[in-house]
Swiss-Prot record:
HAMAP family: UPF0210
Classification via SUPFAM superfamilies: PFL-like glycyl radical enzymes
Protein name per UniProt: UPF0210 protein Pisl_0759
Family stated for the protein in its record: Belongs to the UPF0210 family.
Amino acid sequence: MRFDPSEIGEVLEMLLFRELDIRAVTLSVNTLPAIRPTVGDTLAALEETLEPLLKRLRPAVERVASRLGVKIVTVRLAVSPISIMLEPIGKAEAAVEIAKHLDGLAEKHGVDMVGGFSAFVHAGVSRGDAALMEALPEALNSTRRLAGFLNVASTATGVNMDAVRAAAEAVLKMEPHAAARFAATANMPEDVPFMPGAYHGLGLPDAVVNIAVSGPGVIEAVVRNMPNADVRTLHDAIKRAAFKITRLGELVGREVAKELGVPFGSVDLSVAPSPKVGDSVAAILEAVGLPRVGAPGTLFALALFVDAVKKGGAMATSTIGGLSGAFIPVSEDVVMAEAAREGALTFDTLKSTLAVCNTGIDMAGIPGDAPPDAVAALIADVMAVAVALDKALGVRLVPIPGAKPGDVYDLGGLYGRVVVMDLGKYRDIPLARRKGTAPPAVERLKKG
């Protein structure tokens, strides 16, 4: 990669004054060689597989950050789906032991999060899947760095309503900090660097580095400096800023991969917000011209923003991966959270944004006593969109015990302040109790 002086100068300004950083360096490692018939042997094999890379990961990231003068917010690990590793064991207690062991390894080596406590159950549930699903609440409640998901739908197979219900019931048994590390998903790609969707895909090499970028403050500044620009000019300016953000992401990823001696994988183009003021995707949408995110025009502003980010990112790198859409977690974006607290942002609004490249309903609070029917039905709605439009989508809900709509619960760190949102008045939804798998949409026929 070659950079001209003006590009370097612009990126330096972004780094120094616009909160530009790299959200995550995610090392993805194949842990399937650690499959063993007993949990004790599995734990030992996991350690043997992971430690040679883990002990070098944090130092490598810090060397690259220091050398380039770039802030890297989190260092993460993604492992092969743990449900596969549970196939020969088939016990929930083993899943919990593996979860705690991975959490301990992450803490030991300065890794902020571990992804891959996951199962793909969009077409049915295997022995290992069942063990992981049973263990999910206890495993996540008893850890702090582990993340996972249940992939409950796919364009190829449709929506597994049994798995949707299981995901809803699991979430409602989780403490807030645990639910923030779990999602129900559809069509989850193999190279996602963001949590809780990260895992090591079956088509990847033994180890690979994937990058999650950030920098909404950069794009907000660009938009606010153009109050009278027409929308095409505004789109072009956002696209150019996204190009620079993505180029930085690829540079960091390649340098870390070189330090570790593993291949570089991909850059997720999603511009990730954080709870800090000046680091908000929703603020970009309001700078485009919304009085408040959630107002009429929100979908247009979001579509304009995401299209520009994708086009700028696609020009910057040929290694596009992950979700690469609009990443707008409600609690992790201070402006989104405020809009939700005011009632400007509702679940209906969030569902409508799925059509223009939002990556799901993310980090939204719900009352701790929310009815399972309502939670399952909400997940099913999102999965239906994912199947119909062939999109990768997720639902990450955070139940807050004793809370009512409008209440706020501070999770701290990157998770921010969770606003409890109204799921609606319907507690009894028979549809959410129907079993079986809804067939895939006609979109499936395009794959033939």
